[in-house]
């Protein structure tokens, strides 16, 4: 059985939470809880409120996501 494809959407970080968790408001208005991806943790990429980020959502739970890219 193949792994389901992640849904990639853009959003703006609204709040920084403990343990590299962030509250992100998506372009469609939904607010989700997102954590930092492993590569971003490894390379110490900092995320602050107000940053535009790309989030990967699982098709099974659309309220949680993984931040995979920070726009410059």
Curated annotation (Swiss-Prot):
One of its GO terms (molecular function) is rRNA binding. Residues 1-72 form the S1-like domain. SMART domains: S1. SUPFAM superfamilies: Nucleic acid-binding proteins. Keywords: Cytoplasm, Initiation factor, Protein biosynthesis, RNA-binding, rRNA-binding. GO terms for cellular component: cytosol. Its main location: cytoplasm. It is found in: Cytoplasm. Pfam families: eIF-1a. Component of the 30S ribosomal translation pre-initiation complex which assembles on the 30S ribosome in the order IF-2 and IF-3, IF-1 and N-formylmethionyl-tRNA(fMet); mRNA recruitment can occur at any time during PIC assembly. NCBIfam families: infA (TIGR00008). One of the essential components for the initiation of protein synthesis. Stabilizes the binding of IF-2 and IF-3 on the 30S subunit to which N-formylmethionyl-tRNA(fMet) subsequently binds. Helps modulate mRNA selection, yielding the 30S pre-initiation complex (PIC). Upon addition of the 50S ribosomal subunit IF-1, IF-2 and IF-3 are released leaving the mature 70S translation initiation complex. This is Translation initiation factor IF-1. The gene is infA.
């Amino acid at each position: 059985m193949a792994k389901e494809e992640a849904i990639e959407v853009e959003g703006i970080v609204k709040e920084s939470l403990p343990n590299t968790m962030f509250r992100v408001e998506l372009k469609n208005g939904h607010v989700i809880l997102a954590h930092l991806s492993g590569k971003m943790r490894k390379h110490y990429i900092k995320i602050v409120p107000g940053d535009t980020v790309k989030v990967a959502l699982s098709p099974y739970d659309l309220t949680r996501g993984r931040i995979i890219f920070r726009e410059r």
